[in-house]
Amino acid sequence: MSNEKSPFIVEGKLADNERLKRESNNLRGTITTDLKDDLTGGFTADNFQLIRFHGMYQQDDRDIRAERAKQKLEPLHNVMLRARLPGGVITPDQWLAIDKFADDHTMYGSIRLTTRQTFQFHGVLKPQIKLMHQTLNKVGIDSIATAGDVNRNVLCTSNPVESELHLHAYEWAKKISEHLLPKTRAYAEIWLDGEKVETTEKPVEPILGDNYLPRKFKTTVVIPPQNDVDVHANDLNFVAIAENGQLVGFNVLVGGGLAMTHGDKSTYPRKASDFGFIPLENTLDVAAAVVTTQRDWGNRVNRKNAKTKYTLERVGVDNFKAEVEKRAGVTFQESRPYEFTDRGDRFGWVEGIDGKYHLTVFIENGRILDYPGKTLKTGCAEIAKIHKGDFRLTANQNLIIAGVPPQDKDKIEALAREHGLIAPSISNQRLDSMACVALPTCPLAMAEAERYLPDAVTELEGLLAKHGLEEDSVIFRVTGCPNGCGRAMLSEVGLVGKGPGKYNLHLGGNREGTRIPRMYRENISEQEIMAELDTLLGQWAKERDSGEAFGDYVVRAGVVKPVVDSARDFYDQ
């Protein structure tokens, strides 16, 4: 962190995480000692937090926690790993390695696609952790900085028809990811048995600083009119601006984020602020300048107010922007015009301008596993064995089989149909619904999300049919806690877990992902949620304007007031 004192630095006793990072020897801690300790399946003290910087969270199976306690056993500790995949691109060889590891070395045998456009392994026991990292490394994948107080996996819009434009945007996503990565060799030393370099010179993190960032930091590259990455959920966004099909620069949006804390009104979701346009050559400098400004000015005293969105509100958008311009040596130009029209994935076949085809398949909740009559995991592996292109994971937790030559299209489609990757009929509502993992593995979950969503959607489908709305849908998202991984705070109907079987019901976001929904009912049951939606969907069916989306209707009809400036009006009723 810079030694220069700024009036925008928060004074006070630092959060304990700051001590932890400072004393970690650049993220090494005593992780190697914990790995050798077979008396516990978990990591102790600081290492519990430090493994996050290596892409892992310690978890346990909460379904069996009480039973193990009765037997005087510790929780069944295991780790979840989140891979680093800028833009979500995986080769067939990588897919087959991931598939085999999930089968052979995880408790659940699944591959979980996530809203961060990557995959997660769940249920990896301590003896398998090093093997996991080495297996991924052999096929060119790592999990550096996919969690912790760093810049995390960089997202990029998936599967636009303009495949050349996507390629350029994807290359920038990779460059940004590499530029902002931690420079410590801790990951290679611990997991890959890398050589330890002895030096008297203290390791330096030129961008992140040796205390790293105050809090997690998320970055996207987005290609309008698709907003599949949900720009307003992220700290830093590069909105691609093209001229004659060629990428010429980015509009930069800073300070989005959805996490909040129940009962703490100093926390709230926030949309990202528009800083302006930059040409391509300024991209990495601006990315570093935003990160270092947040590094130096972010709140290291109170972690609940440590994210970039709170820094912007505290210091002022203009001051933050001016500091970024100063550090990057640029002046933001006026933003170039663009429009978001949709966030959903384009299911089915899409032909790119290069003559190759992309098949997007729906993966409910992103959970790739073999089910009775729907062998998704086997199907993906069989496709990987013959596929000459690549796979692309989407930020909506779906899968794209990309770059298929015309002569292979029929073979790929036949395999996809055989294994249930292409279903005979999936409702628009199911396609527009999403949930985070939540129970049983996430330690933060207050309520079900992934396991509740399929039944909730079935009920919602029934309500839509009851009111003659079978062809319509609402953007419906469920998140098991207010940290917001399911991005419910950018949905038309959002459920935020409050306790077992209880949720806060939020209404009034829009389909484009540019309006935050307001809380309509607090701490209500699943039955009460559906009763409320039954009434509101009936009103929508009778009173909507032509083509009016549900989120727009509930705002126009006065069911909820729109959230205009969330820092000041999110909690208004």
UniProtKB/Swiss-Prot annotation:
Protein name per Swiss-Prot or TrEMBL: Sulfite reductase [NADPH] hemoprotein beta-component
Gene3D superfamilies cross-referenced by the UniProt entry: Sulfite Reductase Hemoprotein, domain 1 (3.30.413.10)
Disulfide bonds, paired cysteine numbers: none
GO biological process: cysteine biosynthetic process; hydrogen sulfide biosynthetic process; sulfate assimilation
Xref: HAMAP family: CysI (MF_01540)
Entries under SUPFAM superfamilies matching the protein: Nitrite and sulphite reductase 4Fe-4S domain-like, Nitrite/Sulfite reductase N-terminal domain-like
Entries under InterPro entries matching the protein: CysI, NiRdtase/SiRdtase_haem-b_fer, Nit/Sulf_reduc_fer-like_dom_sf, NO2/SO3_Rdtase_4Fe4S_dom, NO2/SO3_Rdtase_4Fe4S_prot, NO2/SO3_Rdtase_4Fe4S_sf, NO2/SO3_Rdtase_FeS/sirohaem_BS
Keywords noted in UniProt: 4Fe-4S, Amino-acid biosynthesis, Cysteine biosynthesis, Heme, Iron, Iron-sulfur, Metal-binding, NADP, Oxidoreductase
Molecular function terms, GO-annotated: 4 iron, 4 sulfur cluster binding; heme binding; metal ion binding; NADP binding; sulfite reductase (ferredoxin) activity; sulfite reductase (NADPH) activity
Pathway annotation from the record: Sulfur metabolism; hydrogen sulfide biosynthesis; hydrogen sulfide from sulfite (NADPH route): step 1/1
Enzyme Commission number, as recorded: 1.8.1.2
Domain of life: Bacteria
Entry's family note: Belongs to the nitrite and sulfite reductase 4Fe-4S domain family.
EC main group: oxidoreductase
Assembly behavior: Alpha(8)-beta(8). The alpha component is a flavoprotein, the beta component is a hemoprotein.
Record's cofactor remark: Binds 1 siroheme per subunit.
Positions of [4Fe-4S] cluster binding: 436, 442, 481, 485
Job of this protein: Component of the sulfite reductase complex that catalyzes the 6-electron reduction of sulfite to sulfide. This is one of several activities required for the biosynthesis of L-cysteine from sulfate.
Residues annotated as binding siroheme: 485
Gene Ontology annotations for the cellular component aspect, listed alphabetically: sulfite reductase complex (NADPH)
Substrates-to-products reaction catalysed: hydrogen sulfide + 3 NADP(+) + 3 H2O = sulfite + 3 NADPH + 4 H(+)
Cofactor: siroheme; [4Fe-4S] cluster
Name of encoding gene: cysI
Organism from which the protein derives: Alteromonas mediterranea (strain DSM 17117 / CIP 110805 / LMG 28347 / Deep ecotype)
